Amino acid sequence: MIMYATAVQTINSFVRLESLKEVYGLIWIFVPIFSLVLGIITGVLVIVWLEREISAGIQQRIGPEYAGPLGILQALADGTKLLFKENLRPSRGNTPLFSIGPSIAVISILLSYSVIPFSNHLVLADLNIGIFLWIAISSIAPIGLLMSGYGSNNKYSFLGGLRAAAQSISYEIPLTLCVLSISLLSNSLSTVDIVEAQSKYGFWGWNLWRQPIGFIIFLISSLAECERLPFDLPEAEEELIAGYQTEYSGIKFGLFYVASYLNLLISSLFVTVLYLGGWNISIPYISILELFQRDQIFGTTIGIFITLAKTYLFLFISIATRWTLPRLRMDQLLNLGWKFLLPISLGNLLLTTSFQLFSL
């Protein structure tokens, strides 16, 4: 009986250990995801505040100043206001499409953050096809916009959705060709491998210098994918009121608002990863890898800071562009994508392939 009781206690202890392992496993799954989502939300709030301050400076006026010190809580106040607004629905619209559209737009963009390396090995999912996963997922967002436009039963909304789909198709191809050129140089589709390939040669090893034409095309295509001026045709106020967002209010309108800034942030992060060396500081005699070997936490913190500093540099350029260039017409937008960017990006890919073949 004593041996039997001892065996039962041993089995129970093993069962408890296994259950604890499962609990800890679930915790370590949700903690990184929660941390990433919290960081993304904070980043979006910072972008909104920066855009308002930079826009105010360019227009020589005073920006937000009442909601918190220097107006840093203005975006949070606007989001809270949208949460408590009434959620209206068009009486003759397609309710399922109208309701699902904003969620598809936000979720598809959020999934793209899983392959972004914020520092050395600090990535949610280091996949062998990470860069193609981003391209595949980002092509889903325009479907949500088209569903929203069609489900609104409004001619302005429907035109905005059609414009969003046409614009996405026109600029997705040049952007993909630029990514293929980077993959050929790095011999990998993993975002971590692409950053490490640039880190081997320091500052001059950045793909910005090895692919200057691809960088310019990627920059233009990213702005078009984010529907930023001068490419904001799907929601042109003077022509379509608010485009596919015309019939939305409350939290659903807020989701579209958040999706646009999420898309801008993810595009800026991919510019940093693909062309600006990612977390690599690229200063002589200072190596992030050495910092990791000495103090992993300190090295990770420095890597995150460097990645975000490069990202917000591109964000500043996109915000300044908004108040610098006039909006294009729809025919000019499509001509730029199909007649100029597509042939140039294809030629750039062929040149990159030729150089890689001759270097073997």
UniProtKB/Swiss-Prot annotation:
Q: What class of enzyme is it?
A: translocase
Q: Which segments cross the bilayer?
A: 27-47, 98-118, 129-149, 165-185, 203-223, 248-268, 269-289, 297-317, 340-360
Any one GO molecular-function label of the UniProt entry: oxidoreductase activity, acting on NAD(P)H, quinone or similar compound as acceptor
Q: Tell whether Oxidoreductase is among the UniProt keywords.
A: no
Taking the record's annotation, the residue ranges forming a coiled coil are none
Superkingdom classification of source? Eukaryota
Quaternary structure per UniProt? NDH is composed of at least 16 different subunits, 5 of which are encoded in the nucleus.
Protein's UniProt name: NAD(P)H-quinone oxidoreductase subunit 1, chloroplastic
Q: Which organism is it from?
A: Crucihimalaya wallichii (Rock-cress)
The opening ranks of the lineage are: Eukaryota, Viridiplantae, Streptophyta, Embryophyta, Tracheophyta
